[in-house]
């Protein structure tokens, strides 16, 4: 896990404390200190409303957080599905419906991968491809995170587009996960080998 990052702190007074952690307990070292963060105001483009700027940046941070978490969930679901595919081949009691559901989930995950990452088959042919959610959000994040200027109209519009696309993709991701859980339950009833993400059950 990387170190936490975020937008610049607002000007004002802050309190800092130094502590040592030992055996799970924190012990403060010395008294707390107050320090002041001052704006540089070195450019005419610096925002006159830093609180509003930070509010926008924090919204971008949240969308970035959800995007990264969704991508990890997507990859985890792909891994679960790969193990389920192998489990089906080793379980005679599975049905045609299980195989059909696996194929459906595989296609839905592939479509979600395009939504998040873009279509590499198009870009590899040097053709213009729609921007994936992850690329759009990453661009907004790095262009705004440490900026001291008010976000422009294009930045706000791009944020709203990314947020809308992410909401739709997240809804689909949850729906596919529900279908994946149902497939895992079906294979468990058929006596399939253990697969990641599934706790086996004892027979009655």
Segments from the language model and where they lie:
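Mature extracytoplasmic or organellar-lumen-exposed domains after removal of signal/transit peptides
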Residues: 18-20, 33-35, 39, 66-204
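Signal that preferentially marks extracellular ectodomain short beta-strand elements
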Residues: 1-10
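Low-complexity, Pro/Ser/Thr- and charge-rich linker/hinge segments at domain boundaries
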Residues: 27-66
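Short, solvent-exposed loop/turn segments at the edges of extracellular beta-sandwich modules
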Residues: 21-25
């Amino acid at each position: 896990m990387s170190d936490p990052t975020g937008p610049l702190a607002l000007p004002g007074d802050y309190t800092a404390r130094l502590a040592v952690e030992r055996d799970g307990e924190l012990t403060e070292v010395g008294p707390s200190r107050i320090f002041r963060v001052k704006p540089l105001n070195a450019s005419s483009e610096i925002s006159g409303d830093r609180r509003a700027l930070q509010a926008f940046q924090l919204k971008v941070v949240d969308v970035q957080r959800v995007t990264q978490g969704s991508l990890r969930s997507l990859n985890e679901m792909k891994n679960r599905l790969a193990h389920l595919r192998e489990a089906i081949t080793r379980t005679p009691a599975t049905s045609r419906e299980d195989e059909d559901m696996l194929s459906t989930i595989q296609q839905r995950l592939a479509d979600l991968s395009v939504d998040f990452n873009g279509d590499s088959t198009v870009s590899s042919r040097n053709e213009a491809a729609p921007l994936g959610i992850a690329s759009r959000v990453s661009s907004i994040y790095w262009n705004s995170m440490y900026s001291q200027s008010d976000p422009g109209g294009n930045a706000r519009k791009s944020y709203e587009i990314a947020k809308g696309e992410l909401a739709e993709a997240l809804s689909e991701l949850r729906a596919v996960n529900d279908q994946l859980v149902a497939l895992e339950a079906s294979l468990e009833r058929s006596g399939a080998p253990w697969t990641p993400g599934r706790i086996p059950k004892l027979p009655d």
